[in-house]
């Protein structure tokens, strides 16, 4: 039995004399492997168990310290070379084991990253970050509205609150620098902002949430409907400039989409912004301002922030 304690091996001679080390114990074998992996961390502790041995209780524990191109080793127990499998197999198995460990560590880190992505969507981003497009828009200035039947260009539209609603057709976008809509008042008293996740629809209640999916590239986004329109032929929805960028059809101007009304998310959204539905038609007619208690200031989540939170809940992008 060869026992070596607190013995220093230079990395270069170790590589040069690898044949000599083949005849020694697992101690020197492990040193040889460590020498080939000189970029490992400065302190490593390994236990070579039965995975490398043919006999029961065949193990040895080593502590390696790398300092000034030296490897210092302290062996607690060393066994005879004949109790080991071939050196080549040890090297291959050891390196394979290290590779497996590295893969496991990578997977653990990756799962940790994924776990962080699966955290509550309200915790993934700060309210400040989600509110960057409308930081001062903490109270909804519009009001809840379904509205009466109306007529545009000879066609009658009947606003209503459906239990289930989907529609397929063409979408356009508005809010460009030349169309003059940016900053204008919407059909329910809100203020249009081309940088927010909003849309216009002919008959859905205002405000409500809809999921818009671009049929060309399958990209989706959830928007707040706060205006009426569009009234051009074959157009079923107008989205903001920001929404068009997320859906990737800003340059084309028009794209085929599928829209889906989200009644449950709409109810939750209205509660989040403390917007109450009017209880009777007379009250709704006379009440032009929003019906809500002001949002608590300490959470600092803007109206657009709340819309983004719903998108994040469904793992949808909130930026182009």
Swiss-Prot record:
CDD domains with a match to the protein in the record: DPBB_RlpA-like (cd22268)
A single GO molecular function term of this UniProt record: lytic endotransglycosylase activity
The keyword Lyase is annotated on this UniProt entry: yes
EC id: 4.2.2.-
HAMAP family: RlpA (MF_02071)
Purpose: Lytic transglycosylase with a strong preference for naked glycan strands that lack stem peptides.
Family per similarity comment: Belongs to the RlpA family.
PANTHER family named in the record: ENDOLYTIC PEPTIDOGLYCAN TRANSGLYCOSYLASE RLPA
Gene Ontology biological process terms from the UniProt entry: cell wall organization; peptidoglycan metabolic process
Keywords from the named record: Cell wall biogenesis/degradation, Lyase
Disulfide cross-links: none
Protein name stated in the entry: Endolytic peptidoglycan transglycosylase RlpA
Protein's organism: Rickettsia prowazekii (strain Madrid E)
Entry keyword DNA-binding: no
InterPro entries assigned to the protein according to its UniProt record, in alphabetical order: RlpA, RlpA-like_DPBB, RlpA-like_sf, RPE5, RplA
């Amino acid at each position: 039995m060869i026992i070596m304690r607190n013995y220093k091996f230079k990395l270069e001679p170790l590589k040069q004399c690898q044949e000599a080390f083949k005849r020694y114990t697992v101690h020197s074998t492990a040193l040889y492997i460590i020498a080939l992996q000189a970029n490992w961390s400065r302190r490593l502790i390994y236990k070579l168990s039965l995975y490398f041995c043919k006999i029961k209780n065949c193990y040895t524990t080593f502590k390696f310290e790398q300092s000034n191109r030296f490897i210092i080793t302290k062996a607690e127990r060393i066994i005879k070379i004949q109790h080991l499998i071939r050196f080549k197999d040890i090297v291959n198995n050891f390196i394979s084991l290290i590779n497996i460990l590295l893969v496991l560590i990578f997977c653990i880190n990756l799962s940790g990253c994924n776990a962080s992505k699966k955290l509550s969507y309200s915790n993934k981003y700060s309210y400040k970050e989600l509110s960057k497009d409308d930081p001062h828009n903490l109270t909804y200035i519009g009001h809840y509205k379904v509205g009466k039947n109306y007529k545009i260009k000879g066609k009658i539209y009947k606003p209503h609150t459906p239990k289930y609603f989907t529609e397929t057709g063409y979408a356009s976008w508005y809010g460009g620098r030349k169309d003059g809509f940016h900053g204008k008042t919407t059909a329910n008293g809100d203020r249009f902002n081309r940088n927010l996740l909003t849309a216009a629809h002919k008959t859905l209640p205002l405000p409500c949430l809809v999921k818009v999916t671009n049929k060309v590239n399958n990209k989706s986004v959830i928007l707040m409907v706060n205006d009426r329109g569009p009234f051009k032929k074959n157009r079923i929805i107008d989205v903001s400039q920001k929404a068009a960028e997320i859906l990737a059809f800003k340059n084309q101007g028009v794209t085929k989409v599928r829209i889906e009304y989200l009644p449950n998310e709409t109810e939750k959204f209205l509660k989040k912004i403390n917007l109450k539905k009017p209880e009777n038609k007379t009250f709704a007619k006379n009440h032009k301002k929003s019906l809500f208690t002001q949002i608590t200031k300490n959470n600092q989540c803007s109206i657009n922030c709340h819309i983004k939170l719903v998108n994040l809940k469904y793992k949808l992008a909130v930026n182009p």
